[in-house]
Amino acid sequence: MNFTTEELEHLCFVTRVDLNGTKSTLEDTKHYIKVCKKRKEEQWLINEHTSFRDHLKIRVKKEQALLTKLENQFISQGGTFE
């Protein structure tokens, strides 16, 4: 797909915001798993959060790769981040 410089800049911004939110959720989930283990919560609850954590790790990698591609395309089209 071809995007204008303005569209790419906006896509980078939106993707960065989404990535930051996902990273924050990932850190919160990691912390919650530790708390659950200390409290000796039921194993199914820990397993559910562990599965969610693993999903978030994959999502962070995908979003980071997308952001890198968008930023590279933006820069190659002569865009600059302010």
For each of these PLM feature ranges, what is it?
Residues 1-34, 75-76:
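N-terminal acidic leader/helix
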Residues 3, 34, 38, 65-67:
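Glycine-centered signal
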